[in-house]
Amino acid sequence: MSVDTATVAKIASLARIKVSEAELGAMVPELNGILAWVEQLGEVDVTGIEPMTAVIPNKQRLRDDVVNADPLTGGDMRDAVLANAPAPEHGFFGVPKVIE
C-alpha cells in the first residue's frame, strides 16, 4: 500500500492537523516507508510462537473483593449516598441524556 499527497492531506484533515504543502510532500515518502515496514512485519512467520503480552511477567496480587461493613470506610452505603442525589433511578444516579 502506498499513499499520495491527497491521502496525506485527508489524514491530516481527519486528525485536525494543519500541514503545509511543503510538509505534505515530505510526509508522503515517510508514510510510505512506515507502511512498507508494517507490511514487512506482516511477512514474518510467527507460527508456533506464543503471543507476548509483556516483556516481564506481571503478577497481580489481588485481594478478595468483599464489601466492608464499616459505615465510615466500607461499602453498603448505597442508600445513604443516593439520599443526596437529586434524581436516583433504580439504585443508581440519574443523569440527563447527553447523547442521542
UniProtKB/Swiss-Prot annotation:
Its EC number is 6.3.5.-. It comes from the Bacteria. Keywords: ATP-binding, Ligase, Nucleotide-binding, Protein biosynthesis. GO terms for biological process: glutaminyl-tRNAGln biosynthesis via transamidation; regulation of translational fidelity; translation. It is an enzyme of class 6 (ligase). InterPro entries: Asp/Glu-ADT_sf_sub_c, GatC. Allows the formation of correctly charged Asn-tRNA(Asn) or Gln-tRNA(Gln) through the transamidation of misacylated Asp-tRNA(Asn) or Glu-tRNA(Gln) in organisms which lack either or both of asparaginyl-tRNA or glutaminyl-tRNA synthetases. The reaction takes place in the presence of glutamine and ATP through an activated phospho-Asp-tRNA(Asn) or phospho-Glu-tRNA(Gln). HAMAP family: GatC. Heterotrimer of A, B and C subunits. This is Aspartyl/glutamyl-tRNA(Asn/Gln) amidotransferase subunit C. It comes from Novosphingobium aromaticivorans (strain ATCC 700278 / DSM 12444 / CCUG 56034 / CIP 105152 / NBRC 16084 / F199).
